[in-house]
A protein has these predicted regions:
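Short, charged beta-turn/beta-strand-edge "cap" motif at the junction between a beta-strand
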Residues: 56-57, 62-63, 82-83, 107
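Short, Lys/Arg- and Gly-enriched loop/turn segments at beta-strand edges
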Residues: 60-69, 86-89
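Charged, alpha-helix-enriched surfaces in structured cytosolic catalytic cores
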Residues: 71, 85, 113
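Residue-level recognition of beta-strand microenvironments
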Residues: 15-18, 62, 79-82
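Short, solvent-exposed beta-edge and connector elements
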Residues: 35-40, 62, 71-73
Length: 122
């Protein structure tokens, strides 16, 4: 499951442009499947400045704890607070209701892959 309209990173994050200088990102279906049942998500705070490629949160599953890496540089303008009470949404809808962070871009992002290149990676 690799939607065509998104960009991806080698660290298994997806990126969706909202067209107004912001992007939304989360982890891919491949990542959530590898993690297993997600039980906790730690996200950056609104107003925090992220640097592309740097850790910005964590996802805890029944198998392990994995870092979330910022795929872009910018200021966090929103986080998915619904994941606090329902972290399993990342498992059931990683590209929809399981989104994690919205960022106002201020700089370059990590190298990205289109859907075909990401499918080749996984």
């Amino acid at each position: 499951m690799v939607p065509e309209d998104l960009l991806y990173t080698a660290e298994h994050e997806w990126i969706r442009s909202t067209g107004d200088g912001t992007v939304t990102f989360g982890i891919t279906h491949y990542a959530q499947d590898a993690l297993g049942d997600i039980v906790y998500v730690d996200l950056p705070r609104v107003g925090q400045v992220l640097s592309a490629g740097a850790p910005c949160g964590e996802v805890e599953s029944t198998k392990s704890v994995s870092e979330i890496f910022a795929p872009v540089s910018g200021e966090v303008v929103a986080v998915n607070v619904a994941l606090t009470d329902s972290p399993e949404t990342v498992n059931t809808a990683p590209y929809g209701d399981g989104w994690m962070v919205e960022v106002r871009l201020t700089g370059e992002g990590s190298p990205t892959l289109d859907s075909a290149a990401y499918r080749g990676l996984i």
